[in-house]
From Swiss-Prot:
Keyword annotations of the record: Dioxygenase, Metal-binding, Oxidoreductase
Residues reported to bind a divalent metal cation: H57, H59, H101, E103
GO terms, molecular function: metal ion binding; quercetin 2,3-dioxygenase activity
Family the entry assigns: Belongs to the pirin family.
Reaction equations catalysed: quercetin + O2 = 2-(3,4-dihydroxybenzoyloxy)-4,6-dihydroxybenzoate + CO
Protein name in the entry: Putative quercetin 2,3-dioxygenase ZMO1337
Length: 235
């Protein structure tokens, strides 16, 4: 099963400094049919204006993965962590028993990012934060695991979830196959370009919910960049 979610149909919020598209119910956007996909609870497509951002605010019991598409983001939290991540970088914040943090675009141009919230495998984990650079040349033509709750993914940022976050950059004409397995769920979003999954064409910003399929075949119709979360049984 492939469920297409066009960019134009996503939830939308205009805060002036923040333009946000919501793949799932979030804040004032609510759709009873769009609560989660597997363990994916939130997927926000954000554009943050220069010298603006999110002030200190709390989170609890959620694995929050930030994928920078353009620009950069500066993070600070109640654990004493400070960091700046830019395009090609990934940040993971495990909220666990509770964390307070801020995120600002301190740059001269817009920052574009995906922020993905994944439900943890249990509540009460110790909060933590980490980031890592994943040069796009390292995942050209193939999926690279960016964050994962599985011990075999030793190069990925760790999360406390039955899930993995994958990224790939594709040249026009590239085809990659991924063994999803029927009992697992996938949620894929196009960060750049145009791709086809079987007979489903996705453009920049579009998404596909994947379920009950053994293997997915992805073809790049032009140079493309994609992000996918694979999770266990639907929660």
């Amino acid at each position: 099963m492939i469920v297409k979610r066009p960019y134009k149909n996503l939830g939308f919020a205009d805060h002036g400094w923040l333009q946000a598209r919501h793949h799932f119910s979030f804040a004032r956007y609510f759709d009873p049919d769009r609560i989660n996909w597997g363990a994916v609870r939130v997927w926000n497509d954000d554009r943050i204006a220069p010298d603006t951002g999110f002030g200190m605010h709390p989170h609890k019991d959620m694995e929050i993965v930030t994928y920078i598409r353009e620009g950069a983001l500066t993070h600070e939290d109640s654990l004493g962590n400070k960091g700046r991540i830019e395009a090609g970088d990934v940040q993971v914040m495990s909220a666990g028993t509770g964390i307070v943090h801020s995120e600002y675009n301190r740059e001269a141009s817009d920052t574009r990012l995906f922020q993905i919230w994944i439900m943890p495998n249990q509540s009460g984990h110790k909060p933590s934060w980490g980031s890592r650079s994943f040069p796009k040349k390292d995942h050209a033509g193939r999926f690279v695991v960016l964050a994962s709750g599985y011990p075999e993914d030793k190069e990925a940022l760790p999360i406390h979830a039955d899930a993995a976050v994958l990224g790939a950059t594709l040249n026009k004409g590239d085809v990659i196959n991924y063994p999803l397995e029927e009992q697992r769920y996938g949620y894929l979003v196009v960060s750049k370009g145009i791709i086809a999954i079987e007979n489903c064409t996705l453009q920049e910003g579009d998404a596909a919910g994947l379920a009950e399929v053994e293997t997915i075949s992805i073809e790049a119709k032009e140079d493309s960049e994609i992000v996918m979360v694979v999770t266990g049984a639907k929660i």
